[in-house]
Regions:
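Adenosine-cofactor binding site in Rossmann-like domains, unifying the SAM/SAH pocket
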Residues: 1-7
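Conserved acidic-Pro-Pro-aromatic motif
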Residues: 10-94
Length: 94
């Protein structure tokens, strides 16, 4: 049996010690919702120039959660391209 340690995005960001992230690619099989909701609520998303996201639709309330994340993300980023529930790319504008 293998035991994995789960760390928060806040801890990882602090450990890396970098203020600016050029590109973040998110494809974590349904975990993207919790990750992005946390990053948006803590303003960590403002430190990322480009974010590429694969949203998965098998998560409960996937469409509503995706819409809410996209709305919040649009305050700091612009969607450059989107294939709904396949891949999308966002570029920071503020």
């Amino acid at each position: 049996m293998h035991i994995a340690t789960v760390r928060s995005i806040d801890d990882i960001h602090a450990e890396l010690g970098c203020d600016e992230i050029s590109l973040m690619k998110v494809n974590i099989e349904g975990g993207e919702y919790q990750l992005l909701e946390k990053m948006l609520s803590s303003d960590l998303v403002k430190n990322i120039e480009y974010i590429q996201i694969q949203f998965h639709d098998f998560v409960p309330d996937a469409k509503e959660r995706r819409d809410a994340i996209r709305h919040s993300l649009s305050k700091t980023h612009v969607c450059e391209w989107c294939y709904e529930f396949v891949w999308e790319s966002w570029r920071r504008v503020v």
